[in-house]
Amino acid sequence: MSKVKDKAIVSAAQASTAYSQIDSFSHLYDRGGNLTVNGKPSYTVDQAATQLLRDGAAYRDFDGNGKIDLTYTFLTSATQSTMNKHGISGFSQFNTQQKAQAALAMQSWADVANVTFTEKASGGDGHMTFGNYSSGQDGAAAFAYLPGTGAGYDGTSWYLTNNSYTPNKTPDLNNYGRQTLTHEIGHTLGLAHPGDYNAGNGNPTYNDATYGQDTRGYSLMSYWSESNTNQNFS
Protein backbone atom coordinates (compact mmCIF):
# COMPACT_ATOMS: atom_id res chain seq x y z
CA MET A 1 0.00 0.00 0.00
CA SER A 2 1.33 3.44 -0.92
CA LYS A 3 2.08 6.15 1.58
CA VAL A 4 -0.67 8.26 0.00
CA LYS A 5 -3.26 5.58 0.71
CA ASP A 6 -1.84 5.04 4.19
CA LYS A 7 -2.34 8.71 4.95
CA ALA A 8 -5.82 8.69 3.43
CA ILE A 9 -6.86 5.78 5.65
CA VAL A 10 -5.37 7.44 8.73
CA SER A 11 -7.16 10.70 7.87
CA ALA A 12 -10.44 8.86 7.42
CA ALA A 13 -9.99 7.09 10.74
CA GLN A 14 -9.21 10.37 12.48
CA ALA A 15 -12.27 12.00 10.92
CA SER A 16 -14.43 9.08 12.05
CA THR A 17 -13.09 9.37 15.60
CA ALA A 18 -13.63 13.13 15.59
CA TYR A 19 -17.23 12.69 14.41
CA SER A 20 -17.84 10.14 17.14
CA GLN A 21 -16.46 12.51 19.77
CA ILE A 22 -18.54 15.43 18.50
CA ASP A 23 -21.67 13.29 18.31
CA SER A 24 -21.08 12.01 21.83
CA PHE A 25 -20.54 15.55 23.14
CA SER A 26 -23.68 16.83 21.40
CA HIS A 27 -25.74 14.30 23.36
CA LEU A 28 -23.90 14.76 26.66
CA TYR A 29 -26.72 16.77 28.20
CA ASP A 30 -29.69 14.92 26.71
CA ARG A 31 -32.24 14.44 29.48
CA GLY A 32 -35.52 12.75 30.29
CA GLY A 33 -37.46 10.14 28.38
CA ASN A 34 -36.17 6.64 28.87
CA LEU A 35 -32.58 7.77 29.42
CA THR A 36 -30.69 6.72 32.52
CA VAL A 37 -27.60 8.13 34.24
CA ASN A 38 -25.58 5.77 36.41
CA GLY A 39 -28.55 3.43 36.50
CA LYS A 40 -30.88 6.18 37.76
CA PRO A 41 -33.69 7.86 35.84
CA SER A 42 -32.76 10.96 33.89
CA TYR A 43 -34.89 14.03 34.71
CA THR A 44 -35.69 16.79 32.25
CA VAL A 45 -34.87 20.35 33.30
CA ASP A 46 -38.54 20.88 34.21
CA GLN A 47 -38.64 17.69 36.28
CA ALA A 48 -35.46 18.69 38.10
CA ALA A 49 -36.88 22.17 38.79
CA THR A 50 -40.06 20.61 40.18
CA GLN A 51 -37.90 18.47 42.46
CA LEU A 52 -36.15 21.56 43.87
CA LEU A 53 -39.50 23.32 44.40
CA ARG A 54 -41.39 20.32 45.77
CA ASP A 55 -41.90 21.88 49.23
CA GLY A 56 -43.83 24.80 47.76
CA ALA A 57 -41.80 27.28 49.82
CA ALA A 58 -41.56 30.79 48.42
CA TYR A 59 -41.75 34.47 49.28
CA ARG A 60 -44.78 36.48 48.19
CA ASP A 61 -44.62 39.65 46.12
CA PHE A 62 -46.42 41.81 48.67
CA ASP A 63 -46.11 45.13 46.83
CA GLY A 64 -47.09 43.65 43.47
CA ASN A 65 -44.09 45.04 41.58
CA GLY A 66 -43.52 41.75 39.78
CA LYS A 67 -40.39 40.68 41.63
CA ILE A 68 -39.24 39.50 45.05
CA ASP A 69 -37.36 42.22 46.93
CA LEU A 70 -35.46 40.90 49.93
CA THR A 71 -33.53 42.77 52.60
CA TYR A 72 -30.69 41.34 54.66
CA THR A 73 -28.47 42.04 57.65
CA PHE A 74 -25.31 40.54 59.07
CA LEU A 75 -26.04 39.80 62.72
CA THR A 76 -23.88 41.59 65.27
CA SER A 77 -25.20 39.60 68.23
CA ALA A 78 -27.57 36.77 69.08
CA THR A 79 -29.39 36.08 72.34
CA GLN A 80 -29.02 32.79 74.15
CA SER A 81 -32.69 32.17 73.40
CA THR A 82 -32.03 32.55 69.68
CA MET A 83 -29.06 30.20 69.77
CA ASN A 84 -31.05 27.63 71.74
CA LYS A 85 -33.90 27.86 69.23
CA HIS A 86 -31.52 26.82 66.46
CA GLY A 87 -29.65 24.24 68.53
CA ILE A 88 -26.32 26.02 68.28
CA SER A 89 -23.82 27.91 70.43
CA GLY A 90 -20.77 30.15 70.06
CA PHE A 91 -22.08 33.08 68.03
CA SER A 92 -19.73 35.26 66.00
CA GLN A 93 -20.23 37.96 63.41
CA PHE A 94 -19.43 37.57 59.73
CA ASN A 95 -15.95 38.86 58.98
CA THR A 96 -15.23 41.29 56.14
CA GLN A 97 -14.50 38.53 53.63
CA GLN A 98 -17.66 36.62 54.52
CA LYS A 99 -19.76 39.75 54.03
CA ALA A 100 -18.23 40.52 50.64
CA GLN A 101 -18.63 36.95 49.43
CA ALA A 102 -22.20 36.71 50.73
CA ALA A 103 -23.04 39.80 48.67
CA LEU A 104 -21.51 38.16 45.59
CA ALA A 105 -23.39 34.93 46.28
CA MET A 106 -26.65 36.87 46.48
CA GLN A 107 -25.79 38.63 43.24
CA SER A 108 -25.31 35.26 41.55
CA TRP A 109 -28.93 34.44 42.45
CA ALA A 110 -30.16 37.87 41.33
CA ASP A 111 -28.44 37.24 37.98
CA VAL A 112 -30.63 34.22 37.25
CA ALA A 113 -33.84 34.84 39.24
CA ASN A 114 -36.37 37.63 39.58
CA VAL A 115 -35.12 38.65 43.02
CA THR A 116 -33.24 41.62 44.49
CA PHE A 117 -31.19 41.90 47.68
CA THR A 118 -30.68 45.10 49.68
CA GLU A 119 -28.69 45.42 52.90
CA LYS A 120 -31.22 46.96 55.26
CA ALA A 121 -32.42 46.34 58.82
CA SER A 122 -35.91 45.27 57.75
CA GLY A 123 -38.52 45.53 55.03
CA GLY A 124 -39.07 44.09 51.60
CA ASP A 125 -40.97 40.93 50.76
CA GLY A 126 -38.78 39.08 53.24
CA HIS A 127 -35.73 39.56 55.42
CA MET A 128 -32.55 37.47 55.59
CA THR A 129 -29.90 37.26 58.30
CA PHE A 130 -26.40 35.78 58.38
CA GLY A 131 -24.41 34.60 61.40
CA ASN A 132 -21.73 32.15 62.51
CA TYR A 133 -21.81 29.46 65.19
CA SER A 134 -19.05 27.26 66.61
CA SER A 135 -20.93 24.12 67.65
CA GLY A 136 -24.25 22.36 67.36
CA GLN A 137 -26.47 21.04 64.56
CA ASP A 138 -24.57 17.73 64.61
CA GLY A 139 -21.53 19.47 63.14
CA ALA A 140 -23.28 20.58 59.94
CA ALA A 141 -21.14 23.03 57.95
CA ALA A 142 -24.13 25.36 57.64
CA PHE A 143 -27.91 25.38 57.68
CA ALA A 144 -30.81 27.56 56.60
CA TYR A 145 -34.60 27.52 56.59
CA LEU A 146 -37.14 27.51 53.79
CA PRO A 147 -39.67 30.37 53.63
CA GLY A 148 -42.76 29.56 55.66
CA THR A 149 -40.90 27.66 58.39
CA GLY A 150 -42.02 30.24 60.95
CA ALA A 151 -41.13 33.46 62.73
CA GLY A 152 -37.52 33.53 63.85
CA TYR A 153 -36.58 30.92 61.25
CA ASP A 154 -37.55 32.31 57.84
CA GLY A 155 -34.61 33.89 56.03
CA THR A 156 -32.01 32.87 58.59
CA SER A 157 -28.82 31.06 57.65
CA TRP A 158 -25.96 29.99 59.92
CA TYR A 159 -22.37 28.98 59.19
CA LEU A 160 -20.01 26.80 61.22
CA THR A 161 -16.69 28.44 62.10
CA ASN A 162 -14.29 27.02 64.67
CA ASN A 163 -10.70 25.84 64.95
CA SER A 164 -11.59 22.46 63.47
CA TYR A 165 -13.67 23.78 60.56
CA THR A 166 -12.41 26.88 58.76
CA PRO A 167 -13.74 26.95 55.13
CA ASN A 168 -16.59 29.30 56.05
CA LYS A 169 -14.13 31.86 57.45
CA THR A 170 -12.49 32.42 54.06
CA PRO A 171 -15.09 31.98 51.32
CA ASP A 172 -13.83 32.88 47.86
CA LEU A 173 -14.51 32.21 44.21
CA ASN A 174 -14.48 28.47 43.46
CA ASN A 175 -13.89 27.35 47.05
CA TYR A 176 -16.20 25.41 49.36
CA GLY A 177 -16.95 28.39 51.61
CA ARG A 178 -18.41 30.39 48.71
CA GLN A 179 -20.30 27.35 47.47
CA THR A 180 -21.79 26.90 50.94
CA LEU A 181 -22.97 30.52 51.03
CA THR A 182 -24.69 30.24 47.66
CA HIS A 183 -26.22 26.87 48.57
CA GLU A 184 -27.68 28.11 51.86
CA ILE A 185 -29.05 31.27 50.25
CA GLY A 186 -30.77 28.94 47.80
CA HIS A 187 -32.56 27.34 50.75
CA THR A 188 -33.66 30.72 52.11
CA LEU A 189 -35.15 31.43 48.67
CA GLY A 190 -37.20 28.23 48.83
CA LEU A 191 -35.08 25.61 47.08
CA ALA A 192 -34.79 22.12 48.56
CA HIS A 193 -32.07 19.58 47.89
CA PRO A 194 -32.66 17.61 44.68
CA GLY A 195 -33.29 14.52 46.83
CA ASP A 196 -34.64 13.66 50.27
CA TYR A 197 -31.35 13.82 52.18
CA ASN A 198 -29.85 16.21 54.68
CA ALA A 199 -26.61 16.65 56.61
CA GLY A 200 -26.85 15.02 60.01
CA ASN A 201 -29.45 12.49 58.86
CA GLY A 202 -27.31 9.38 58.46
CA ASN A 203 -24.52 9.34 55.91
CA PRO A 204 -26.15 9.96 52.53
CA THR A 205 -24.17 9.43 49.33
CA TYR A 206 -24.82 9.76 45.61
CA ASN A 207 -26.34 6.28 45.83
CA ASP A 208 -29.25 7.95 47.64
CA ALA A 209 -29.92 10.33 44.74
CA THR A 210 -33.40 10.10 43.24
CA TYR A 211 -32.27 10.87 39.70
CA GLY A 212 -29.00 10.72 37.82
CA GLN A 213 -28.35 14.44 37.40
CA ASP A 214 -28.45 15.08 41.15
CA THR A 215 -24.87 16.41 41.25
CA ARG A 216 -23.23 19.83 41.40
CA GLY A 217 -22.68 19.48 37.69
CA TYR A 218 -26.34 20.42 37.34
CA SER A 219 -27.33 22.18 40.58
CA LEU A 220 -25.40 23.69 43.48
CA MET A 221 -28.30 22.58 45.67
CA SER A 222 -26.95 19.03 45.33
CA TYR A 223 -24.63 17.43 47.87
CA TRP A 224 -22.78 15.33 45.33
CA SER A 225 -19.66 16.11 43.32
CA GLU A 226 -19.95 16.72 39.58
CA SER A 227 -17.45 13.88 39.15
CA ASN A 228 -20.39 11.49 39.60
CA THR A 229 -21.67 12.67 36.22
CA ASN A 230 -18.24 12.78 34.55
CA GLN A 231 -17.66 16.52 34.93
CA ASN A 232 -14.75 18.39 36.46
CA PHE A 233 -15.11 22.01 37.56
CA SER A 234 -11.82 22.25 39.44
Regions found by a protein language model. Give the residues of each.
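Short conserved micro-motifs at the rims of enzyme active sites and ligand-binding pockets
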Residues: M83-K85, N230-S234
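Metzincin-family zinc-dependent endopeptidase catalytic domain
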Residues: H27-N65, Q97-R216, Y223-N232
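Disordered inhibitory propeptide/activation segment of secreted metzincin zinc metalloprotease zymogens
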Residues: M1-F94
